[in-house]
From Swiss-Prot:
One Gene Ontology MF term: 1-(5-phosphoribosyl)-5-[(5-phosphoribosylamino)methylideneamino]imidazole-4-carboxamide isomerase activity
Family: Belongs to the HisA/HisF family.
Organism: Methanosphaera stadtmanae (strain ATCC 43021 / DSM 3091 / JCM 11832 / MCB-3)
Cellular localisation: Cytoplasm
Pathways per UniProt: Amino-acid biosynthesis; L-histidine biosynthesis; L-histidine from 5-phospho-alpha-D-ribose 1-diphosphate: step 4/9
GO biological process, one term: L-tryptophan biosynthetic process
Protein name per its UniProtKB record: 1-(5-phosphoribosyl)-5-[(5-phosphoribosylamino)methylideneamino] imidazole-4-carboxamide isomerase
Keyword Nucleotide-binding: no
InterPro entries, per the entry: Aldolase_TIM, His_biosynth, HisA_bact_arch, Isoase_HisA-like, Isoase_HisA-like_bact, RibuloseP-bd_barrel
Alphabetized UniProt keyword annotations: Amino-acid biosynthesis, Cytoplasm, Histidine biosynthesis, Isomerase
Top-rank EC class of the record's enzyme: isomerase
Enzyme Commission number(s): 5.3.1.16
The UniProt record lists the keyword Isomerase: yes
């Protein structure tokens, strides 16, 4: 299991939101590129970047993404507001290792086949955000009629190299995790699962490692000091 610190960018700053809601910023740090560099220096092997302005439909933080790429050596996975094939290609071509595609993939699954054919499966990740066991889109504002498992099977066939699974019901609340949806995903697809949402302690990491999760994204718990990256990395295999 690989531990991936999150760097969420909004209005040019590193922030942490509660359940993705604008106006709920609980952590605000001025320089996202420096934050990313510090996580790398502390041992992170991969970085998870979220352009919240992109995800919320209010613009992009492309210059900051470029700065993070320049200042760090670790592979970067990036999501948030990728609304077209050209958006995805631009990010892949400036040095983002893996693009995380959510709403666009749900609307047009064939895009995943196109991108994975051109750039390789390992560079294409599909984000499945789950609320009440239904996949939600458009920054968690709209609900679909399909479960995460239904979509995960579809995108595995389409050539996605990994699935980022976020349980919106627990995301940012620091109340711990719900294992059942993750176990179901692990039992139904063979591509790597990246888990995000509700992690509060190293005990959560131990359980996720024990059930076979491949990657874990940690945000709020790191920024609020509930877990240190040093302790989290003890569960890295």
């Amino acid at each position: 299991m690989i531990i991936i610190p999150a760097v969420d960018i909004k209005n040019g700053k590193c922030v942490q939101l509660v359940q993705g809601e604008p106006g709920t910023e609980q952590v605000v740090i001025e320089n996202p590129a420096e934050v990313a560099k510090q996580w790398e220096q502390k041992g992170a092997k991969k970085l998870h970047i979220v352009d919240l302005d992109g995800a919320l439909g209010s613009g992009r933080n492309l210059s900051i993404v470029k700065e993070i790429i320049e200042k760090t050596k670790s592979p970067i996975q990036l999501g948030g507001g990728i609304r077209s094939v050209s958006d995805a290609k631009k990010l892949l071509e400036i040095g983002v290792n893996t693009v995380i595609i959510g709403t666009m993939a749900i609307k047009n699954p064939e895009i995943i086949k196109e991108l994975s054919s051109e750039y390789g499966c390992e560079r294409i990740c599909v984000s499945l955000d789950s609320k009440n066991n239904k996949v939600v889109t458009h920054g968690w504002k709209e609900s679909t009629d399909k479960t995460p498992i239904e979509y995960a099977k579809l995108f595995e066939k389409m050539g996605a190299g990994s699935i980022l699974f976020t349980n919106v019901d627990v995301e940012g609340l620091l109340n711990g995790i719900n294992l059942e949806p993750i176990k179901e995903l692990l039992n139904n697809v063979s591509i790597p699962i990246i888990y995000s949402g509700g992690i509060t302690s190293v005990d959560d990491l131990k359980v996720l490692s024990d059930i076979g999760v491949d990657y874990v994204v940690i945000g709020s718990a790191l920024y609020k000091g509930l877990i240190t990256l040093e302790d989290a990395l003890k569960y890295q295999k």
